[in-house]
Amino acid sequence: MNEADVTKFVNNARKTLTDAQLLCSSANLRIVDIKKKLSSWQLSISKLNFLIVGLRQQGKFLYTILKEGIGTKLIQKQWNQAVLVVLVDEMKYWQYEITSKVQRLDGIVNELSISEKDDTDPSKLGDYISRDNVNLLNDKLKEVPVIERQIENIKLQYENMVRKVNKELIDTKLTDVTQKFQSKFGIDNLMETNVAEQFSRELTDLEKDLAEIMNSLTQHFDKTLLLQDKKIDNDEREELFKVVQGDDKELYNIFKTLHEVIDDVDKTILNLGQFLQAKIKEKTELHSEVSEIINDFNRNLEYLLIFKDISNLIDSFKNSCTQDIQTTKELCEFYDNFEESYGNLVLEAKRRKDVANRMKTILKDCEKQLQNLDAQDQEERQNFIAENGTYLPETIWPGKIDDFSSLYTLNYNVKNP
């Protein structure tokens, strides 16, 4: 065993191992890079699938909102039924009520204003009421045709939107993009999936081959270093020399095999890269269609906001009508109370007239009694003077003895109520 040979073996093993490490490291970097691209592509496909599934659910949700939320609840129940039928009927009813009450008041003569000296037409109860809010509901009813046209226009837009969402968006675009995805990347295209998995398995196998070659070269290099150790006995060292010598002769073939494996790595990477490039192009094209669908959803969202704005306007009209109905109800109640109070006032006037008549009767009776008493008093005075006047001097009761003026003065006035 020649020490020079040992040194040569060590140098050959070191150089081969170093060169192999450089080649394998570079190859491994390329493998890692292409695997990252493969993983990134697979992740992007998963995201695209998630996006498409989400859009399909959003399409169903949008269609449900249109059919049930807008079509049934908003247009049919709230607008057509609650506003154009129930609300309009209620406004017509209360407008008729208040008009009838005003006409009734206009036909009732104010008995309290009738005078024998006044030959003009007597006033009516309608002359004493405010008419500012009598036609509130009539004014609102005049706005109803405008609201009807708005509802009809929005209904046409709604029907057009439902058709587009159902036929163009859901049945056509979403269905088409779903079928394309399943055809190109989904479970319907197992071949494409198998190709990607096959490339991945090939690269993994090639990585193992590279690892085995590197392991073999490392073991050989360790053996050459062991030959330099003088502590092992000669027999064992001689046996190790033969092994190392044989392995040294195989270094060329091993290195050649390494190059072949690396060539396979590069071919696989190239094929996988071309495969990914084609798939990425297909995904990009499909993603463009998905982006167009997203834009359609955004446009539909803007249309929904239009429905919201119209709904707010109609709600505002409805609330205003409700307030006017309440005002009209209160006015009708006031007119009823006014007529009832007028009836009570007529009774009160009659009562006062009766009281005045009673007062007149009492006063006339009192006047008659006073006149009778006064006549009796006059007679008594005359008798007194006849009997006693001759004997009584005037000065004893100055101005009183022969005074025949009445003892009472009666002035009264009973108002004509």
Curated annotation (Swiss-Prot):
State the organism named in the record. Answer: Saccharomyces cerevisiae (strain ATCC 204508 / S288c) (Baker's yeast)
Predominant location: cytoplasm
Briefly state the protein's biological role.
Autophagy-specific protein that functions with ATG13, ATG29, and CIS1/ATG31 in response to autophagy-inducing signals as a scaffold to recruit other ATG proteins to organize pre-autophagosomal structure (PAS) formation. Modulates the timing and magnitude of the autophagy response, such as the size of the sequestering vesicles, through interacting with and regulating ATG1 kinase activity. Plays particularly a role in pexophagy and nucleophagy. With ATG13, is required for ATG1 activation by autophosphorylation of 'Thr-226'. Recruits ATG9 to the pre-autophagosomal structure.
**PANTHER family membership:** AUTOPHAGY-RELATED PROTEIN 17 (PTHR28005:SF1)
What gene makes this protein? Answer: ATG17
Protein name, UniProt field: Autophagy-related protein 17
Topology of this chain in the membrane: Peripheral membrane protein
Q: How is the quaternary structure described?
A: Forms a complex with ATG13, ATG29 and CIS1/ATG31. The ATG17-ATG29-ATG31 complex interacts with the ATG1-ATG13 complex. Forms a complex with SNX4 and ATG20. Interacts with ATG11 and the conserved oligomeric Golgi (COG) complex subunits COG1, COG3 and COG4. Interacts with ATG9 (via N-terminus); required for recruitment to the PAS during autophagy and starved conditions.
* Pfam entry (one): ATG17_like
Source domain of life: Eukaryota
Entry's Gene Ontology molecular function annotations: molecular adaptor activity; protein kinase activator activity; SNARE binding
Keyword vocabulary terms for this entry: Autophagy, Coiled coil, Cytoplasm, Membrane
User: Is Methyltransferase one of the keywords?
Assistant: no
Q: Which family does it belong to?
A: Belongs to the ATG17 family.
Q: Which GO terms describe its cellular component?
A: Atg1/ULK1 kinase complex; cytoplasm; nucleus; phagophore assembly site; phagophore assembly site membrane; protein-containing complex; vacuole-isolation membrane contact site
Q: Which GO terms describe its biological process?
A: autophagosome assembly; autophagy; autophagy of mitochondrion; cellular response to nitrogen starvation; mitophagy; nucleophagy; pexophagy; piecemeal microautophagy of the nucleus
The listed locations are: Cytoplasm; Preautophagosomal structure membrane
The taxonomic lineage of its organism, from the top, reads: Eukaryota, Fungi, Dikarya, Ascomycota, Saccharomycotina
Q: Which residues form a coiled coil?
A: 146-221, 353-384
Q: In the UniProt entry for this protein, what further remark is given in the free-text comments?
A: Present with 358 molecules/cell in log phase SD medium.
